[in-house]
């Protein structure tokens, strides 16, 4: 149930209580006083409804704008971002990386990479422990377990938690990503008793908080903006306002959905095998499962709408370029 629906239900409940109990049977006052007070209460509720109505309309307008303007990185932006966050190598120093030590570089690279490649929410990233990283018995399959944790060393005031039942999930890891994570665990993340994966790298090695992660992203954003100011220029329609964990998740969702749709289209031997609607539904279900959205969440549909709009615009431009008549 949305906030709007809850507030409407609350107003209805107030009116029900008044109708049921605002009478001489339950109130020890005169009928005249009952009537006068009821008028004042009704006027009060009416004023609150009007305020709520304005708030509700404003909220809908803002939400509509956001829906049509989900900010995510283009493929070029993603490639340039990875050039910024790539950790130093023994033979090659990354002068664009804003973090000075290799330990910080690898930790922060992995955080961005997991969000960008696997669609993790920031809270899910904060829940990861060293035991979240698993391999199969024959070591040919690797997984990341997304679940709640009860680490006794978690001192964070605002503790992260799983968003919904569907957010509990097992995500298959690329073998190279598994190696990066194990390198981090064995060489960097081996200094205290806590199992939390992403912590401060200085004593007392506290688990990273929401504000700590936002500060890391702000540092990366400043380096990104310095190297590529055009990406933040709002005169360009595909610019971004800022780089945040949610922008990474938006980017992952759109890229993943587009890949799934193209994959299912290519697998369809004949156009009669699967309709476009069937292909879209399969791709949306993949996105929903991988992203940990609940069955009634409309978020996957937002990305589908954007994909359809982008595809339609591309088709129209192709049509224009192929027209026989020219101006």
Give the location of each predicted region.
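Catalytic-site neighborhood detector that most strongly recognizes the C-terminal catalytic loop/helix
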Residues: 278-284, 289-318
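C-terminal catalytic core of Y-nucleophile DNA break-rejoin enzymes
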Residues: 156-182, 195-221, 241-245
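Flexible interdomain linker/hinge and immediately adjacent N-terminus
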Residues: 26-91
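Short, charged phosphate-coordinating catalytic segments
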Residues: 20-23, 115-141
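Non-catalytic DNA-binding core/recognition domains of DNA-processing enzymes
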Residues: 1-38
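Short, basic (Lys/Arg/His-rich) helix/loop patches that form interaction surfaces
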Residues: 214-289, 293
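Basic, Lys/Arg- and aromatic-enriched nucleic-acid-binding interface segment
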Residues: 84-122
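Conserved tyrosine-mediated DNA breakage-rejoining catalytic core shared by Y-recombinases
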Residues: 89, 93-97, 127-180
């Amino acid at each position: 149930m949305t906030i709007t629906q809850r507030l409407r239900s609350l107003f209805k409940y107030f009116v029900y209580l008044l109708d049921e109990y605002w009478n001489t049977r339950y109130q020890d006052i005169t009928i005249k006083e009952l009537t006068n007070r009821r008028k004042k209460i009704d006027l009060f509720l009416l004023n609150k409804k009007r305020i709520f109505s304005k708030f509700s309309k404003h909220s809908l307008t803002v939400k509509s704008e956001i829906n049509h303007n989900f900010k995510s990185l283009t493929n070029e932006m993603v490639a340039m971002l990875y050039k910024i966050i790539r950790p130093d190598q023994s033979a090659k120093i990354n002068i664009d990386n804003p973090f000075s030590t290799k330990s910080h570089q690898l930790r922060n690279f992995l955080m961005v990479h997991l969000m960008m490649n696997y669609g993790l929410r920031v809270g899910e990233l904060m829940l990861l422990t060293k035991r979240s990283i698993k391999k199969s018995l024959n070591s040919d399959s690797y997984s990341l377990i997304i679940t709640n944790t009860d680490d006794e060393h978690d001192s964070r005031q605002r503790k992260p938690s799983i968003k919904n039942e569907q957010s509990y999930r097992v995500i298959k890891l690329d073998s190279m990503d598994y190696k990066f994570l194990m390198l981090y665990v064995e060489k960097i993340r081996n200094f205290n008793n806590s199992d939390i994966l992403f912590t401060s790298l200085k004593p007392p090695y506290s688990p990273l908080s929401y504000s700590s992660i936002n500060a890391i992203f702000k540092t990366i954003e400043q380096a990104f903006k310095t190297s590529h100011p055009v990406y933040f220029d709002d005169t360009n329609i595909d610019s971004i306002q800022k780089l945040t964990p949610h922008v990474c998740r938006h980017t992952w969702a759109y890229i993943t959905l587009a890949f799934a749709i193209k994959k299912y289209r290519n697998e369809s031997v004949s156009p009669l095998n699967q309709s476009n609607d069937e292909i879209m539904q399969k791709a949306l279900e993949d996105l929903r499962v991988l992203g940990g959205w609940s069955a009634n969440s409309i978020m996957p549909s937002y990305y589908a709408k954007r994909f359809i709009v982008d595809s339609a615009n591309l088709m129209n431009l192709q049509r224009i370029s192929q027209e026989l008549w020219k101006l």
